[in-house]
């Protein structure tokens, strides 16, 4: 009885304070410990299957679902999730994957059936890209850079309702990384952004490990639901396609020339930083820098971006002090992330977001990037092929080109009978004002806006030609290609890293 009186007096004291303070704070309501523990069961995040996870996530028609592309061409998560979503009858969804590849061809049918009606992505390849280029999707695809995606998410334009994140392993509370388990993909740099910003986060994992699983790239307080599946991705396919290490003699020639350009650019000095983009020649530049770094006793402070086996090798030899990894480009890089303390995982926000308080690209000295096309104004296309069909990705191209002290584009002058250097690119991803040097197998051109670079290279005995001279050389080799015919219909909108529209892609005329 005394206990009830004391409880009543305490409640009256609280109510009196609320009245005096003119506030509306809720009064404490006592409940049994068992009730709390039933509501907060230790295994409450675990779902028996993907259908249960989707149902519990609260997904509804018209919402936005997101995915990451750490597995690149080996991704199995997008198709698996979208197949179940389609069977459950959902319609009119926005699909926001950090990038899409050849392996995502099954999305074509989901678009035809009205399951997916809008897409945000960095890139498109294969049958999906071909069908969209021919007008499959009613609304234009929104193409963004890696940094630009984070900006769209944080600005509120791209609101992620449910993020489905495939990982090799996690514990029953959601702590996960990408380098523990069979499907070792390395950095989860793109997934971290989704985990930070999505209203609901569903973790798909191949393996459940004891709690607490650490280090955790994605942490327990970011994850709502967990479902164990057989496979989330084929890690063996990460280092294929655009991230392969080349043996092509022409690409190696271009890479060697680019390394010479870097050495004599004025930026090759103790403590410099570097990044190489996707594409055979750009990735190969790193291997040619090793001897030059040794002979001049130069070490890089960091390498950034997509990390490769070659960069790991230089790191372990002491030539690159730290690796800042937003995406691991091969199994060696993924495994290095687990064993090397100075191989550091970073999010796409830390990597390249224009609106970030501290994007690593803003500390970058040298970047080497590839191109499908480049024109005489140094504008670069990495999205559409010479036939006008979508077959590439914006990636971090425009993010790094503008932010780095020195941006180098490496590309063959011609590919077969198709010129790489043209009068005007079909699609502009990176504006020419961001590009400093073009290195081809027929010569090197420097942007006239950077005369000091041309002077340094010439003083070192490197021949520099005008981009107009290279364009004429390409014309002599290939002739004038037939112009591509397009319809008036826009199939893709290209967003610059700040969210502005830099170009549009029209439907190819059949």
UniProtKB/Swiss-Prot annotation:
Function in brief: Represents a citrate:acetyl-ACP transferase.
GO molecular function, one term: citrate CoA-transferase activity
NCBIfam families with a match to the protein in the record: citF
Induction cue: Repressed by H-NS. Part of the citCDEFXG operon.
InterPro entries: Citrate_lyase_asu, NagB/RpiA_transferase-like
Recorded catalytic activity of this chain's protein: citrate = oxaloacetate + acetate; citrate + acetyl-CoA = (3S)-citryl-CoA + acetate
Matching Pfam families: CitF (PF04223)
Quaternary state and interactors: Oligomer with a subunit composition of (alpha,beta,gamma)6.
Taxonomic placement: Bacteria, Pseudomonadati, Pseudomonadota, Gammaproteobacteria, Enterobacterales
Subcellular location: Cytoplasm
Enzyme Commission number: 4.1.3.6, 2.8.3.10
Annotated protein name in UniProt: Citrate lyase alpha chain
Assigned GO CC terms: ATP-independent citrate lyase complex; cytoplasm
Organism: Escherichia coli (strain K12)
Record-annotated membrane-spanning stretches: none
GO biological process: acetyl-CoA metabolic process; citrate metabolic process
């Amino acid at each position: 009885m005394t206990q009830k009186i004391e409880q009543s007096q305490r409640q009256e004291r609280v109510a009196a304070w609320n009245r005096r303070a003119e506030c509306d704070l809720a009064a404490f309501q006592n409940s049994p410990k068992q009730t709390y523990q039933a509501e907060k069961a230790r295994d409450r995040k675990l779902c028996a299957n993907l259908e249960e996870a989707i149902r519990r996530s609260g997904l509804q028609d018209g919402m936005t679902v997101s995915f990451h592309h750490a597995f690149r061409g080996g991704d199995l998560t997008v198709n698996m999730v979208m197949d179940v979503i389609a069977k459950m009858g959902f319609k009119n969804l926005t699909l926001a994957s950090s990038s899409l590849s050849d392996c995502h061809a099954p999305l074509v049918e989901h678009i035809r059936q009205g399951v997916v009606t809008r897409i945000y992505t960095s890139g498109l390849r294969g049958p999906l890209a071909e069908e969209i280029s021919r007008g499959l999707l009613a609304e234009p695809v929104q193409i963004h850079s890696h940094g630009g995606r984070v900006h769209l998410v944080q600005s509120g334009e791209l609101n992620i309702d449910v993020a489905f994140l495939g990982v090799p392993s996690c514990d029953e509370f959601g702590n996960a990384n990408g380098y523990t388990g069979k499907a070792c993909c390395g950095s989860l740099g793109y997934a971290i952004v989704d985990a930070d910003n999505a209203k609901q986060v569903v973790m798909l994992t191949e393996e459940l490990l004891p709690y607490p699983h650490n280090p955790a790239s994605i942490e327990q307080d970011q994850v709502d639901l967990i479902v164990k599946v057989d496979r989330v991705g084929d890690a063996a396919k990460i280092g294929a396609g655009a991230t392969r290490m080349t043996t092509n003699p022409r690409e190696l020639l271009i890479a060697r020339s680019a390394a010479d350009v870097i050495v004599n650019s004025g930026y090759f000095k103790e403590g410099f930083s570097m990044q190489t983009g996707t594409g055979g020649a750009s990735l190969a530049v790193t291997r040619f820098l090793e001897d030059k770094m040794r002979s001049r006793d130069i070490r890089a402070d960091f390498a950034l971006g997509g990390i490769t086996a070659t960069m790991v090798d230089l790191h372990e030899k002491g030539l690159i002090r730290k690796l800042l990894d937003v995406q691991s480009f091969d199994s060696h890089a993924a495994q290095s992330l687990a064993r090397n303390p100075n191989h550091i995982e970073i999010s796409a926000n830390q990597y390249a977001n224009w609106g970030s308080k501290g994007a690593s690209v803003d500390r970058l000295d040298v970047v080497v990037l590839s191109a499908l096309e480049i024109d005489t104004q140094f504008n670069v296309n990495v999205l559409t092929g010479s036939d006008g069909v979508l077959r590439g990705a914006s990636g971090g191209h425009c993010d790094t080109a503008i932010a780095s002290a020195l941006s180098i584009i490496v590309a063959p002058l011609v590919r077969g009978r198709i010129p790489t250097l043209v009068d005007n690119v079909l699609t502009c991803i990176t504006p020419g004002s961001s590009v400093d040097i073009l290195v081809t197998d027929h010569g090197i051109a420097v942007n006239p806006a950077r005369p000091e670079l041309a002077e340094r290279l010439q003083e070192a005995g490197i021949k520099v030609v005008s981009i107009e001279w290279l364009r004429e050389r390409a014309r002599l080799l290939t002739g004038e290609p037939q112009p591509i015919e397009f319809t008036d219909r826009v199939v893709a909108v290209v967003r610059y890293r700040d969210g502005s529209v830099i170009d549009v892609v029209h439907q190819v005329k059949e």
